[in-house]
Amino acid sequence: MGAEGGGRRRALRLGAYVGCGAVLLTGCASMPDSGDLRGVESTPRQDAQVRVFAMPPREDAAPAEIVQGFLEALTSDDPQYETAREYLTGDASKQWRPYKSTTVLADGPNPEPERTRNRETGDDFAYTLTGSRLAKVDGQHAYAPDSGDYTGTVHLTLQRKTGQWRIDALPQGVVMGKSDFERNYKSVNKYYFASNVPAGTSGQLGTVADPVYVRGKVDPVTAMVTELLKGPTRWLAPVARSSFPTDTGLKKGVTSLAPDDQNKLTVPLNKKADRVGRAQCTKMAAQLLFTLKDLTPTGVDEVELQRSDGSTLCDLGEAEAESIASHGTGKSGEYEYFIDGEQRLVRLSGSSNGKDPDPVPGALGEGAKKLRAAAVSRDEVTAAGVSFDGSSLYVGSLVSGASLGEAVVHSAGTTEKDRLTTPSWDGGGDLWVADRDPAKSRLLLLQKGSGEPLEVRTPRLDGRIDAVRVAADGVRIALIVERDGKTSLQIGRIERETKADERADVSILELHSVTPQLEEVTAMSWAGDSRLVVVGREKGGVQQMRYVQVDGSTPSGSAPASLTGVQQIAASEDERLPLVAYSEDGIVRLSSGAQWQKVMKEGTAPVYPG
């Protein structure tokens, strides 16, 4: 439950000056001067470095003051909600589980008094909390969009011994408004290894990002280490694995972790990890380094894991971690690719300015087959191209003189829009494409880009696939799905089983929309380990471009600069590389901190490797 309403608060400010710096502690909770309970509005966004602390209940506070003070205390940076518990009776405090869930409302919860339940004694009150749900963070700290009305009841009783009002019954978890949630919580990726995907073309293990929300100013390092040790969240668990032995946790008595002045983090573990060998230990340390990389201002450069007796299990630096698993910027490609005015596949170096693109080596760059779309493998050795009419898919080598064989997939759709989508390569070298033929719409997979196409099972798909983008990890897939004239962006989990004949049985499970507020999604692309860039439109609105997380949340930071008439978008999972789009101005590029720049007027279908 959370409070908001800056105008009502009597903020307590303490400035502690050290040299030229200052640390500001800002109190968030105060009591209304009267017994009337006003709506709890959203707190304005505050500086990320400001710590917010709650005020305890004042003597002889009225029931309305207790409820509002408790709601505001929930939005503070109190590590264990100790101040919030002062508003509860002893029994209620023991039964309350604030970490069970966090419900996010459009505005702060609005408390409305109910009739006094005991009119004769007047020693109890009840308040109904109402609001509009936006999202929920579960006990595993996983975020999910939500909608509908929120209702919860807070009951108070007059304590006979003290004569003070206290809350004796309340909903489990916490509830707060959107702006308080954004101020209090931070989205961070935990990293695990893909469990059912072959190693990538480099032979390295592949990492999978598992985004969770933790309280950003309440010891986030310890929180993230603890959450990583617990294993993947429920949605990701079937396709991801941890190198930490089951039930591994922090050594008993260890309550806080912090890197030293050399950015080295020491992590004492319990007995479950005592007998781990070095090879496994380095994978464990790599998971920690990937997870903690961007969590602190200076980062974590080295991790030391310790046994329960304090001896060193292993240590690992950042460079060594990158050699263990493909991760982050190691996935980036050398070129941007698109289709030029002659319907050839061409490429342009990401660092080039004002230079004309070059046709790719091989048949797809020679113009023998006119193309409307293409995809380049992540190692930039092979490419797939869709014929200009959308009916055929070809795969060819990006080597000078390489020929092009017969089409590997055909669509019988009667119009271009009812034929093949732009294809997509995963990190294991498999090729994906959707056939939009209304008579036989299907999602297809070509293992290593060749052989007989495998039809992928989509048991809960409600609509037709209009676009496909597979994440580099090979375990998550983004789909634009059309149904009844509306389109949505959905994320699914890729599960693979090998049959007796060694052919894979592949399914897309637990599809869920990550853009419920958009009525139309025009284009999308992966733009990070757990982030996508989306072009779409809200009901009655205009086209816009935004970033969205795979869990449906909005990442911190600004949206891309606006651009008119965007039809296609391409981003790299290396977030340092520019966005590339096809708009009414042709192929355009957006580098960080810059404006959109025209690359080529006669060009379409931009892509990065993948």
Swiss-Prot record:
Residues 1-27 form the signal peptide. Pfam families: Germane, Gmad1. Keywords: Cell membrane, Lipoprotein, Membrane, Palmitate, Signal. It comes from Streptomyces avermitilis (strain ATCC 31267 / DSM 46492 / JCM 5070 / NBRC 14893 / NCIMB 12804 / NRRL 8165 / MA-4680). GO terms for cellular component: plasma membrane. Its main location: membrane. The lineage of its organism: Bacteria, Bacillati, Actinomycetota, Actinomycetes, Kitasatosporales. This is Lipoprotein LpqB. A lipid is attached at residue 28 (S-diacylglycerol cysteine). It is found in: Cell membrane.
